[in-house]
């Protein structure tokens, strides 16, 4: 890696994807962690490289089983490895509602709290939750625009992710130039959320998002091409738009049912 990057050291080097499993091989998340980082001597090797200055800051990225996240931090507490940062998923929906989205998830409030109380820095992924927080239902967009008409819906999520004291870096996947310009506007310089703005997102916007029974599709198109020629993301995105605009008939008791059925 050093040769490919034409350098003699890494500023930030991480253990990637702890918490995942290889169930098809009979390895649960903890077993895979031990196999990849402990039993093969990798942890000792990286500790040595950190002592030599080849690695300036060592961390890990967390995805999956929270027991492995806790275990990795215990290794840090016990002095078996010295971490400087952790890459976690953090956004205003996952802060308190991650488990409501997926029971396998862990609330970002807990993840960040465990990182911060040890004085470690947090790198943030999924600040927009795969684009979901930049494509909100029309009613929620209107509420955000009433409070701040001059900034994008996405900027609320990016400001939320960048506000906590121990957040060092927020990762952003950008597709278009306007995304880059919006991010630069948001972070140059960052205008931290006030406590009142954070509560507005945590207690008002987030709860409404959870109550919308949309299909969790981010139009990533990973499911395409469909062998049957169906535009899967196109259908799901259209359904979600109809749902967010209250254009989905809920039952035969709905006065608009007959009209919708004819359509």
Question: Which sequence ranges carry the predicted segments?
Answer:
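Glycine/proline-rich, positively charged
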Residues: 1-124, 128, 136-140, 148-149, ...
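Structured C-terminal cap/extension of enzyme domains
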Residues: 79-82, 110-263
């Amino acid at each position: 890696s050093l040769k490919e990057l034409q350098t003699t050291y890494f500023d930030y080097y991480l253990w990637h994807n702890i918490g995942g499993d290889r169930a098809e091989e009979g390895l649960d998340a903890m077993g895979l962690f031990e196999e990849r980082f402990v039993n093969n001597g990798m942890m000792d090797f990286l500790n040595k490289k950190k002592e030599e200055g080849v690695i300036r800051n060592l961390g890990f990225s967390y995805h999956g089983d929270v027991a492995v996240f806790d275990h990795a931090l215990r290794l840090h507490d016990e002095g078996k490895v010295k971490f400087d940062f952790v890459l976690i998923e953090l956004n205003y929906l996952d802060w308190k509602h991650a488990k409501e989205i997926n029971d396998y998830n862990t609330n970002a409030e807990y993840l960040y709290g465990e990182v911060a109380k040890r004085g470690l820095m947090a790198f943030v992924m999924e600040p927009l939750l795969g684009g979901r927080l930049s494509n909100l239902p029309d009613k929620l967009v209107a509420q955000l625009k009433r409070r701040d008409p001059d900034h994008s819906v996405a900027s609320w999520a990016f400001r939320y992710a960048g506000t906590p004291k121990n957040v060092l870096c927020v990762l952003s996947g950008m597709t278009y130039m306007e995304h880059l310009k919006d991010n630069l506007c948001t972070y140059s310089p960052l205008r931290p959320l006030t406590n009142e703005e954070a509560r507005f997102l945590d207690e008002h916007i987030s709860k409404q998002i959870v109550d919308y029974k949309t299909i969790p599709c981010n139009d990533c198109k990973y499911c395409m091409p469909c062998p049957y020629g169906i535009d899967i993301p196109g259908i799901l995105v259209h359904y979600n738009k109809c749902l967010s605009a209250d254009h989905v008939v809920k039952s035969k008791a709905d006065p608009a049912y007959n009209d919708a059925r004819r359509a």
